[in-house]
């Protein structure tokens, strides 16, 4: 993909889409930002609000506007952050429960985008992101490396922050990844987590910390904290918007950086033909390569169990919805 004028189209002007648009402006990541929303007046208001921030930011002038699908043909990136109308999460929900109406929404958005002549990269943030990324890939017909879900970017950030707080270390010095589904079956690959260049397991033996929780406890906190945030403020937006911005920067700046995204597996971890969370090299082409971590037996079993769940849900959707 050749990128000259860096153009991003955001489909969905809710909390995530709006915060992501703000990140694009503040971080000076895009030259043109087009916002598509079912309520076009909200997209227009967001666009004006962002334009009014520009004079006080260290960013180049931008073209920011409310758009429709006729504006996507020359976009480099289309971000799907739209959410289907649904009941609130409720107590201890599963993202996969409200899947069918979300699949139909994402399918229709993808069709409209492709009918308009889009030939760039899709970034999928709508949940359940792994299943919906696969829907986008199948409906769009684009090469799989150009459809990327946010995957476990947010869980990985949460893991790094939690570990850093316990060790009183800058989270940028915590390295490792949360894998598999963006949801209840995700897990941190603790055998690969390091503090600097020191394995976390070695660090904890060398510098004992009686207040450091078990790995299972941290995994549980990572899985549950999103719901805690949602129940208190009605959404989660800053973390996932920052994750999207990080992906965007990697693409536009051709960084060849390793990020834990929802990527299409073609044999990695012994799995085929599905999207799930794994480290991948991200550059201007999208996913340049999916990386396979060396996992313990227990971690391999967790990964396999998660993929079984995702495959079951995607297969059930294919039976109910025409893709």
From Swiss-Prot:
Keywords attached to this Swiss-Prot or TrEMBL record, sorted alphabetically, are: Allosteric enzyme, Cytoplasm, NAD, Oxidoreductase
Q: In which compartments does the protein localize?
A: Cytoplasm
The pathway is: Fermentation; pyruvate fermentation to lactate; (S)-lactate from pyruvate: step 1/1
**What gene name is listed for this protein?**
ldh3
EC numbers listed for it are: 1.1.1.27
Which source organism? Lactococcus lactis subsp. lactis (strain IL1403) (Streptococcus lactis)
Function, as annotated, reads:
Catalyzes the conversion of lactate to pyruvate.
Summarize what activates or inhibits it. Allosterically activated by fructose 1,6-bisphosphate (FBP).
Pfam families referenced in this protein's UniProt entry, alphabetically = Ldh_1_C, Ldh_1_N
Q: Which HAMAP family match?
A: Lactate_dehydrog
Sequence positions that bind beta-D-fructose 1,6-bisphosphate: 160, 175
Q: Name one GO molecular function term.
A: L-lactate dehydrogenase activity
Tell me yes or no: is RNA-binding among this UniProt entry's keywords. Answer: no
This chain's protein is named L-lactate dehydrogenase 3
**Stated family:** Belongs to the LDH/MDH superfamily. LDH family.
Q: Biological process (GO) annotations?
A: glycolytic process; lactate metabolic process
Which cellular component, as a GO term, is one annotated location?
cytoplasm
């Amino acid at each position: 993909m050749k990128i000259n004028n860096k153009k991003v189209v955001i489909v969905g002007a809710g909390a995530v889409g709006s915060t992501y648009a703000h990140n694009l402006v503040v971080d000076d990541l895009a030259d043109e930002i087009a916002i598509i929303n079912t309520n076009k007046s909200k997209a227009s208001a967001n666009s004006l609000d962002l334009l009014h921030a520009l004079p006080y930011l260290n960013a180049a002038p931008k073209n920011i506007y409310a758009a429709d699908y006729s504006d996507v043909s020359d976009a480099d990136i289309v971000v799907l952050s739209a959410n289907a109308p649904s009941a609130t999460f409720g107590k201890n929900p599963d993202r996969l429960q409200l899947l069918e109406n979300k699949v139909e929404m994402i399918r229709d958005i993808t069709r409209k985008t492709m009918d308009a002549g889009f030939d760039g990269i899709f970034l999928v943030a709508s949940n359940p992101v792994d299943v919906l990324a696969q829907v986008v890939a199948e409906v769009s017909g684009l090469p799989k490396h150009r459809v990327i879900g946010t995957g476990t970017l947010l869980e990985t950030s949460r893991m790094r922050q939690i570990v850093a707080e316990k060790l009183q270390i800058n989270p940028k010095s915590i390295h490792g990844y949360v894998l598999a589904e963006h949801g209840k079956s995700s897990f941190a690959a603790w055998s690969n987590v390091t503090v600097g260049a020191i394995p976390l397991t070695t660090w904890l033996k060398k510098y004992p910390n009686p207040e450091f929780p078990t790995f299972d406890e941290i995994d549980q906190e990572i899985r549950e904290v999103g719901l805690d945030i949602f129940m208190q403020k009605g959404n989660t937006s800053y973390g996932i918007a920052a994750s999207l911005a990080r992906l965007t920067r990697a693409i536009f700046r051709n960084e060849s950086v390793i990020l834990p995204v929802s990527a299409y597996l073609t044999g990695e971890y012994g799995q085929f033909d599905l999207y799930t969370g794994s480290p991948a090299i991200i550059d201007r082409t999208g996913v340049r390569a999916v990386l396979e971590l060396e996992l313990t037996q227990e971690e391999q079993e967790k990964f396999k169990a998660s993929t079984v769940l995702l495959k079951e849900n995607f297969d059930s959707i294919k039976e109910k919805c025409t893709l």
